[in-house]
Amino acid sequence: MGHSRRPVGGEKKSRGFGRSKAAADVGDGRQAGKPQVKKAVFESTKKKEIGVSDLTLLSKISNEAINDNLKLRFEHDEIYTYIGHVLVSVNPFRDLGIYTDNVLESYRGKNRLEVPPHVFAVAESAYYNMKSYKDNQCVIISGESGAGKTEAAKRIMQYIASVSGGTDSSIQQIKEMVLATNPLLESFGNAKTLRNNNSSRFGKYLELEFNTNGEPVGANITNYLLEKSRVVGQITNERNFHIFYQFTKAAPQKYRDMFGIQQPQSYLYTSRSKCYDVPGIDDSAEFRDTVNAMNVIGMTESEQDNVFRMLAAILWIGNVQFAEDDSGNAAITDQSVVDFIAYLLEVDAAQVNKAFTIRVMETARGGRRGSIYEVPLNTVQALAVRDALAKAIYFNLFDWIVQRVNSSLAARGEIANSIGILDIYGFEIFEKNSFEQLCINYVNEKLQQIFIQLTLKAEQDEYAREQIQWTPIKYFDNKVVCSLIEDKRPPGVFAALNDACATAHADSGAADNTFVGRLNFLSQNPNFENRQGQFIVKHYAGDVSYAVTGMTDKNKDQLLKDLLNLVGSSGNQFVHTLFPEQVNQDDKRRPPTASDKIKASANDLVATLMKAQPSYIRTIKPNDNKAPREYNVGNVLHQIKYLGLQENVRIRRAGFAYRQTFDKFVERFYLLSPKTSYAGDYTWTGSAESGARQILKDTSIPAEEYQMGITKVFVKTPETLFALEAMRDRYWHNMAIRIQRAWRNYLRYRIECATRIQRFWRRTTGGLEFIKLRDQGHQLLNGRKERRRMSLLGSRRFLGDYIGVGNKGGPGEMVRNGAGISGSEDILFSCRGEVLVSKFGRSSKPAPRILVLTNRHIYIIAQNILNNQLVISSERTIPIGAIKAISASNLKDDWFSIVVGSAQEPDPLLSCVFKTELFTHLNNALRGQLNLKIADHIEYSKKPGKMATVKVVKDPAVTGDDTYKSSTIHTGAGEPASSVSKPTPRPKPVSARPVTKGKLLRPGGPGGGPSKLASRPTPAAQPLPRATPQPAAAQPAAPQPAARVVPQPVAAVAASHARTGSTASVRAPPPPPPAAAPAPKKPTAKALYDFNSQQPNELSIKAGEIVQIVSKEGNGWWLCMNMATSSQGWTPEAYLEEQVAPAPKPTPPPPPPAAPRSTPTPVNGAAAAAKAKPAPPAPPAKRPNMAGRKAVPAPPPAPRDSAVSMNSHDSSGGSGRGTPNSASNASLAGGLAEALRARQHAMQGKNDDDDDW
């Protein structure tokens, strides 16, 4: 992604998270030229959005709607949400795995709209804008304690350190030191609170400094509002600063010996709250990280020793205990503790005793030094002095650590720009709020004021710069609350507090009462309420009640001169470094109070932030229990209100919920317009602005829903953006469907091509094994037996299992189960046949049986009806090894016997139309050892051990099946014994069918070549023929329309037949103009017979039906179309009679002037003859010879059932299917005669053999 450029000669563009590209050519302020648009790609890893990722896109703007959206996203582990350029973060209280290096890299160089909301997106935007626009940046992180501010600050530092580049060793060292400041400052500045286990108890503004190349060259840290009161006291279940527990638990033995370090339970300052451990925090490991961070920033061992010396001194100072002496004054109970403190601070123990128990006071008169008094302290005052010394040491030690870090992070090159990260603990409301909460909340009020001013100002500036009309939104400006606290005139809370401290400085109780009196002057302020012992300030985050007690003492925030003199007398140079100020005994001016320091720090911070371009992160804590998946709706709703998220959304949505630069808008949505895209490529040649207009026009977005600025598109409502995004998603969906359709079509094409190749190959070679079996049958007979004509058909195949006994399911399985055929036996042959059955006292007769040959047995299976149920059983089972011979005749009959020679059973005499095939399979099963006896008779054992002979005679009277009578078989003449099967007939031509449909692939295939099928007749590709009318005699060149008949009275009609004289006739009217020639009608044909289609490309017709002729083929088939259903198919020409269109009647000439009387026509004359109905023409004698087609006529004599459907031809060469016999009729209709002549012509060029079926 290229860097953006600033507008030439113009003001800076508004920048936030998103990257804005300025116009490349600035003339009238609008973009010119074709934008550089990246090709759109489908986001394959894009997750389905949960709720809305930008709160400005909410349909309903309310605190509850914001809360519901945040809750929904939180429950789906989406903790980040935008409000325009503001990031809202909800603390998950667990590791979601979203800060890995891979995630970090996914945000490098990305616009915020290209990636989901994330703190890395804020860091990327800040770094990008600093590097591209040379503007200082700052990231303001706000929220209450435990909301995740510190974590967000660390992640920003992590991202910037990763992407800022720089291979120089000094730059890498700066990065390491910047990252090392986190564990160091967290140890000294963070603590466990009730709401957060790692709560920052100070404010930090980290300023990262960069050179012109965007490489870090230094950093600077400014700290604010350290909660030093935590050093001396904590409430139950809270802890002191982390460093005290790290040091007492994991200090090396050297420090334990030097500084007397013991466990945290031994010190008052670490044991008062009875909380020593924190879940999820290893103090020992954290101590090692702290020491390592000290080493990284370059802290020497001597400096580290002094730091830990001061920590030890603070811990031992807390163990100093006081008791009342006889005078009621404070007395130290354990002098050894004081002695050890003096050893640590390198001061005199007597001075420590005096500083803790005696206060030196000085009186002054008229500006002159007065008397000096030593005033003993009571135990309460002594404890206060003790705690004040501990707090002062730790406060100054923390400042020294920050300064030491800054000295190590000092810039090592020229500073061009900076990025500031403000991490300050947020708004606090406790049951009891004091001076610390007032200062914290005051600083947060100042930050909120900056946020409102800069956010609103940025919106107003952008609308003005883009020349957009908008309506200002009312919002709460908290400037009045800031003035209530910080103003001097009229005096605010801080001014009243300082005045009370100056007026009654000696007595803290009197000072507090004075402060309460001063607050009465603020009662007229609508944001303030004064109550007994406390006052209420109406902050932007809610009303907070502050307790007055002790507030003046905390505001004084100064050490007694006795304590300053004590540390000033130290022999340790490091102590002097912590307390560099020399005590001026003559200085009578009031030192600055804590409120003065807070006010000055806050104003300096505001001034620093106003010099930078801000980014905002608003953190939210979902619950007070630090539970990972708990979302407290009430608590979050309260935070939403005091963070002002609803007002922020309203300001951001001040008329427009979405805005984007022209080029980015076009890059995102150019797919939605056919004029700006083609096949996913950007095709618009105009400017980005015109492209954006075209997209909005083609997507039918109403003009009132958007405005075009100078460089941006402004969309009014979120629903419009949702619609655009939905259309974009739908585009990818549609493209995916197209690709899938094309791919599926291509797969179908491949499958169809493979199927056709396979079909052709199987048609060519697939039946070879069956043909080989058929040839083996010829060899087995060896010219010894006459053949039946049907056995010699070229299409005859020895398929074997005709009943399907070897199949799973169907009637074949029933036969197998009924006959008890073992599953281990292979079925070689099955067919229906007959067996000669001898009955006592009756002549033998054939009976139907089922013959099954396996690799082991021959089964003769009978089917009987028993109790109205079909019973299938094996009548006889003959092992093939027991067969001695097969006896058959030399004629064409189907009878044969299986010679077994059994002593118990006779030999079976069988009849089977597929006898030769049975012989062949049996011979193969016997490995060629079959003894086939062929003679003029058939031998078999009619009874066990008694041979009989059956004669076979040729009887010309037998034209059908063989007949058996009295041991003689009568059969007709057959084909010569030397006959062999005819060649396999060529299949009839079929209409070409395209390989694919839908125009996705050409009929010729992916290569685009012409299909070979195109040469075949295709119904859709044939031109429609035109009917040619028969010529009529004396037909005029241009036919005239018939004259319109006008009804006349009866008298007039009668008069027209009367004889008239030769008087002059009345002139006839002129004839009407000739009409246009009618369009030629399409040829039709009438069905003479019923025809039932047998193939998918044939058309069924009924006798008398009229069909339209599409094309005629010379092979006896016409392509016709059913005019009712528009279905097309092939129909036999012989079944149709073409309807000849009658010639149009010529226009009758005009009537003559005088018509002679006509002679009446006899009733029984020519007219009557013409009206006579002609005799119907005889149907054709024979259908065209078409193998494989079933005919409709009267059925032939029922053949013997062989379980095979075949087109049996009679011996006379007929089709085997009778058609109506032709009657001798001298006159045939013209259409039928023409059809018969065409058929005869077509048949003359072919051999009229019986193999073409």
Swiss-Prot record:
Gene Ontology MF term list: actin filament binding; Arp2/3 complex binding; ATP binding; hydrolase activity; microfilament motor activity
Any single Pfam family the record assigns to this protein: SH3_1
Modification Phosphoserine, positions: 371
Superkingdom: Eukaryota
TH1 domain: residues covered: 787-977
Location of this chain's protein in the cell: Cytoplasm, Cytoskeleton, Actin patch
Any one annotated GO CC term: cell cortex of cell tip
Note on domains (UniProt): The myosin motor domain displays actin-stimulated ATPase activity and generates a mechanochemical force. The tail domain participates in molecular interactions that specify the role of the motor domain. It is composed of several tail homology (TH) domains, namely a putative phospholipid-binding myosin tail domain (also named TH1), an Ala- and Pro-rich domain (TH2), followed by an SH3 domain and a C-terminal acidic domain (TH3).
Domain SH3: from-to ranges: 1080-1141
Compositional bias (Pro residues): 1068-1081, 1143-1155
Keyword Transferase: no
High-level lineage: Eukaryota, Fungi, Dikarya, Ascomycota, Pezizomycotina
Region (Actin-binding): 418-500
Function: Type-I myosin implicated in the organization of the actin cytoskeleton. Required for proper actin cytoskeleton polarization. At the cell cortex, assembles in patch-like structures together with proteins from the actin-polymerizing machinery and promotes actin assembly. Functions as actin nucleation-promoting factor (NPF) for the Arp2/3 complex. Plays an important role in polarized growth, spore germination, hyphal morphogenesis, and septal wall formation.
Domain IQ: from-to ranges: 733-753, 754-779
Protein name: Myosin-1
Keywords: Actin-binding, ATP-binding, Cytoplasm, Cytoskeleton, Hydrolase, Motor protein, Myosin, Nucleotide-binding, Phosphoprotein, Repeat, SH3 domain
Binding site for ATP: 143-150
Residues in Myosin motor domain copies: 50-729
Post-translation changes: Phosphorylation of the TEDS site (Ser-371) is required for the polarization of the actin cytoskeleton. Phosphorylation probably activates the myosin-I ATPase activity.
Main localization (coarse): cytoplasm
Low complexity bias locations: 1029-1055, 1156-1173, 1221-1235
Region of interest (Disordered), residue spans: 1-40, 959-1083, 1139-1253
Family of this protein: Belongs to the TRAFAC class myosin-kinesin ATPase superfamily. Myosin family.
Example GO BP: mitotic cytokinesis
